[in-house]
Design a protein with these regions (language model features):
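Short beta-strand/loop element within the Bergerat-fold HATPase_c
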Residues: 71-83
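Short alpha-helical Gxxx[C/S/T] motif in the catalytic ATP-binding
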Residues: 122, 126
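Short conserved segments within the C-terminal catalytic ATPase subdomain
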Residues: 29-38, 43
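A conserved beta-strand-to-alpha-helix junction within the catalytic ATP-binding
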Residues: 9-24
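Conserved micro-motifs of the catalytic ATP-binding
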Residues: 2-8, 41, 45-51
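Short conserved segment of the HATPase_c
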Residues: 96-108
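Conserved glycine-rich
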Residues: 135-136
């Protein structure tokens, strides 16, 4: 993201459309590993930069595809939680070890034993996009008691 990103005007963004677009765009890649992606319908909206938010959810979903085993599943969901909107990308892959969770958002950080290609910048970019939108990312356990849920909390669009 360029230094002027934080100054671009925000618009009303449909979370449902965002999740549906990511599902549609990444299904062919997920299909190569027989991974199922589902995007739950949502009529929630937030104010933000649509292209940046799309990049954020795409990056998180792409990471989930990379780390989820053949035949796995990924769920894209959104829900209202008081004055916050939570967007979740959940998978049933191997998960992120507790010891690595605090560091995965550092630029160029790669967990030991990671066999997936990448440069270690993706989650740092995701975190920056969340910050620009006054959001926060939490890493939680994923589906079926394993895997990872990346939960981004945004202020409600009033």
């Amino acid at each position: 993201l360029d230094p002027d990103s934080a100054r671009r005007p925000f618009e009303r963004v449909s979370i449902g459309e965002l999740l549906s677009t990511v599902q549609h765009d990444l299904e062919p890649i997920a299909g190569e590993k027989s991974i199922t992606i589902t995007a739950a319908p949502s009529d929630l909206t937030i104010r933000g930069m649509k292209d940046a938010l799309l990049m954020m959810v795409t990056n998180l979903t792409d990471n989930a595809i990379k780390y989820t085993q053949e035949g796995g599943r990924i769920e894209l969901t959104a829900l209202q939680d008081g004055s916050r909107i939570l967007v979740r990308v959940s998978d049933n892959g191997p998960g992120i070890p507790e010891k690595d969770r605090a560091r995965v958002f550092e630029r160029f950080y790669r967990a030991l034993g990671t066999h997936v290609s990448g440069n270690g910048l993706g989650l740092a970019i995701v975190q920056r996009i969340a910050e620009i939108h006054h959001g926060h990312i939490d890493i939680k356990d994923g589906l079926d008691g394993r895997g990872t849920t990346m939960e981004i909390s945004f202020p409600s669009d009033s």
